[in-house]
């Protein structure tokens, strides 16, 4: 289902990505090995690949993706998907120039606040690579609790060709 929703906070604005965002997304997010290190996808090979992802993969099926804007600039991405009818899983990434400023915590908090109005959502989860302290901090600041370390749970192709350990965070929202 297409995402048309805009969420806004004091520092960030979340809006659906459009094809015109491809160059900025490629330059700041999709081509940066620092950003993609702990993601499930490899850096894009060019703007054309980013354009293709925007038009074919974002906001398809049960996933909603937002572009994170800071001062009108492309700063990151965040998404949520429904692995089960009653649960939502969150994911996100942010360009390094905006790390350490609480921006992704604000973006995730906006997604969580929006979910509270959905009576069909009972649980929210997110996981991050076990070594990704920054992401774990975002999830803790947003009120998710560490539920455990899952051994060899997810692929991070920019780290290894073998499954890696993750930290699983969760929260009941009703």
Q: How should these model regions be labeled?
A:
Residues 1-24, 28-32, 67-174:
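Acyl-donor (CoA/ACP) binding surface of acyl/acetyltransferases
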Residues 34-56:
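Conserved GNAT-fold acetyl-CoA-binding loop/helix
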Residues 35-36, 45, 60, 121, ...:
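Generic macromolecular interface patches on structured domains
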Residues 42, 57-60, 118, 127:
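Histidine kinase transmitter module recognition
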Residues 46-48, 61, 158:
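A short hydrophobic/aromatic micro-motif that marks alpha-helical segments and, especially, helix-coil
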Residues 54-67, 76:
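A short helix-loop-beta-strand connector motif used in the catalytic cores of GNAT acetyltransferases and
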